[in-house]
Amino acid sequence: KLGELLKAIEQWNGTPTVRALLRISPYVFTRPSEVRLMKWSELDLDAGIWTKQADVMKNGIAHVVPLCTQAVAIIKELQPFSGRFEYVFWNVAYRQPLSEGATRKALERLGYKGQFSPHGWRHTASTLLHEQGFNSMWIEAQLAHKDSNEIRDTYNHATYLEQRRE
């Protein structure tokens, strides 16, 4: 079913910005609002890095997201559409970032109403990576979750950036 959804997204003829937002979400598995509000100034596309500042993160901690080559390519495709604006996923018609409902509505148009949500990428990624035996610390770091072990959370400031690139 997941493969069918990914194929449907690739073939969808919707707005380029909304389509790009749908396409990039499975690669970064950040919170929907975080990816939707991605700023050009947060990106280092040559290094494949996206840095979210602490003030916009749910947990109040800056978050570095490694970008795979596919994610970088998707972002670069948007430069002609939104490169002159602050936000990558810009709604030209309304002169603001894409709305919270943009991807949800797109998923509904694709026939996935009630079957999949924009936040679902995080659940799917976590499940698939755990099933494949990836280290839980790396997965939780990618999801920007605080460590449930308070002592480890206090002392361990590792980002596992290279491991998360896998």
Residue ranges and their predicted role:
Residues 1-38, 46, 57-61, 81-82, ...:
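Basic, Lys/Arg- and aromatic-enriched nucleic-acid-binding interface segment
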Residues 26, 32, 39-40, 47, ...:
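Active-site proximal loops enriched in glycine and acidic residues that flank catalytic Cys/His/Asp
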Residues 23, 27-34, 98, 102, ...:
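C-terminal catalytic core of tyrosine-transesterase DNA break-rejoin enzymes
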Residues 52-60, 72, 95, 143-166:
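Catalytic-site neighborhood detector that most strongly recognizes the C-terminal catalytic loop/helix
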Residues 14-18, 67, 71, 99, ...:
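Hydrophobic (often cysteine-bearing) scaffold residues that line and stabilize catalytic clefts
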Residues 7-10, 26-29, 40, 55, ...:
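Hydrophobic alpha-helix feature that most strongly marks membrane-spanning transmembrane helices
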Residues 1-4, 47, 66-115, 137, ...:
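Active-site/catalytic core of tyrosine-dependent DNA strand-transfer enzymes
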Residues 42-49, 113-115, 134-156:
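Short, polar N-cap/turn motifs at the start of nucleic acid-interacting alpha helices
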